[in-house]
Amino acid sequence: ATIASDAVRRLGGRTLVLTTTLRALRAIGDVMKQKLEGSGIEVLVQGEWPKRHLMERFREGTKAGEGGCVLVASATFWEGFDVPGDALQLVIIDKLPFPPPNDPLVEARSKRLEAQGRSPFNEYFVPEAVVALKQGAGRLIRTESDQGVLVLCDNRLVTTGYGRRLICALPPMRQL
């Protein structure tokens, strides 16, 4: 959250932070509010306002001379949230978006694959993470003229074999 706060200041807001858990959402939201206090950048945290209000305020961005916004959100903002133009220039994803292993539906699918002698991780968890990661990254580029930065804060992208699979599934972009 500290590194993100520095980037957010430089951009004047215009940042979407996508989290994989509600605990991370609250923790990151609290730290961002503290770090950005007095900066003129509004920190919006999912759950503090209705979704519609959060989306409208974020899209307003820097209109009318106001400071931009940071939106810290989880699952419901990974897809279906379009912000074309300059209001969004940075998307930060806290961790790889694997399905929650303790979810009853996820458990059932895993057990079914295991019963068939297949790998739930390779055949279910990784493909689901690929789809979610693409959706999260897709929040950044909505039109041909949009550009921005995607930051993935999970070192498993570069330390594991499946991390490479996830990177390859992302839209073409320069990697730093």
List each language-model region with its residue ranges.
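ASCE RecA-like P-loop NTPase motor cores
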Residues: 1-176
